[in-house]
Each structure stands twice: as C-alpha cells, then as structure tokens.
C-alpha cells in the first residue's frame, strides 16, 4: 500500500468550508466567520493562505490543515494555523509553517509574528521549535474564555 502524500498548495475559496471545519474542531482557535475567510482569501496583495492536501491512493484528495497569514511592509503575521486532529503531530503543521515562512521571506518580510494563548503549551512548543521567541504579552487578548496571549516572533531577515 502506497503511503499518503501531503501537498501544500495555495488555498482557494472552494476550500473555505473545509478550513472552517478544521478550525471549529479546535477549541483554542479563535473562530472566524465565513465572511472573514472570504475577505482574507480575496486579498491576495497582503494575505496568503495555504492548505495541506492529502493525496490518497484512491486518487481522492482531502484537506487536512491550513495556515493563513498577512504580510504588510516587512512583517508577516500568522493569523491561524491548524491541522485536523487525526493528523496532528504528523509533520503537516511543520510543512504549513515552513511554507508560510518561506513565502513571507520571498515577499521580503523580515520577521514573522503571531499570538498564542498562554495556556496552549503544545502550540508554544511548536513555535519554539521554529526558534520563535516570546516578545511580549497581550492582556485579555482572547475571549471564551478570557485569556492573555504571548506575542511570539521569528527573525527571518537573513
């Protein structure tokens, strides 16, 4: 049996329902409206997004993860990154983050920033693995439940 192959590609509007399904499956993510996703996917000049698509032996493809980020001037901000729970810790998140960092560098960003719930240790450790550092905090940044956020950043100026 052939192993499953993951392909990272630019997200399309037709992917929004699947992106929302993945996002909604994780409690720690801020849940966006469908209109927010349409606005972001229509803004190619500043916002980029990728999906991870499994190419299965049967020939069917399924989206199992996504990353959405915004580049303005020399800063790229990761808005959201998630992988379907059944594929967590499989390396797909790493592929998505690598694609976002590479695209940010290609578009002349000098650093990547993001916010993460202070209690989300798996995500914090994931970002530390990319050598993000904790640059600050935002008090009461998240709601449902109210929680502070770490601001993390990665220098990609080299």
Summary of predicted features, one role per range:
Residues 80, 84-98, 105-107, 111, ...:
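Conserved glycine-rich acetyl-CoA-binding loop
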Residues 66, 135-137:
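Residue-level detector of high-confidence beta-strand sites
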Residues 1-3:
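Short, conserved catalytic or adaptor-binding loops enriched in Gly and charged residues
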Residues 49, 110, 117-121, 130, ...:
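C-terminal "cap" of GNAT-fold acetyltransferases
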Residues 6-8, 132:
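Generic structural signal for residues in well-ordered beta-strands
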Residues 31, 90-91, 146:
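Non-catalytic, surface-exposed connector residues within folded enzymatic/regulatory domains
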Residues 10-86, 97-99, 103, 107, ...:
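Acetyl-CoA-dependent GNAT
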């Amino acid at each position: 049996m052939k192993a499953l192959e993951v392909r990272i590609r630019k997200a399309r509007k037709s992917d929004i329902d699947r992106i929302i399904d993945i996002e909604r499956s994780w409690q720690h993510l801020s849940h966006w409206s469908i209109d927010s996703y349409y606005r972001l996917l229509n803004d190619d000049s500043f916002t980029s997004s990728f999906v991870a698509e499994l190419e299965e032996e049967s020939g069917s493809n399924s989206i199992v993860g996504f990353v959405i980020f915004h580049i303005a001037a020399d800063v790229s901000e990761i808005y959201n990154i998630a992988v379907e729970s059944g594929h967590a810790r499989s390396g797909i998140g790493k592929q998505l983050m690598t694609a976002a960092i590479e695209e940010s560098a290609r578009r002349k960003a000098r650093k990547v920033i993001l916010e993460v719930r202070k209690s989300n240790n798996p995500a914090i450790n994931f970002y530390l693995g990319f050598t993000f550092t904790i640059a600050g905090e935002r008090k009461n940044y998240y709601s449902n439940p109210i929680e502070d956020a770490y601001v993390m950043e990665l220098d990609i100026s080299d």
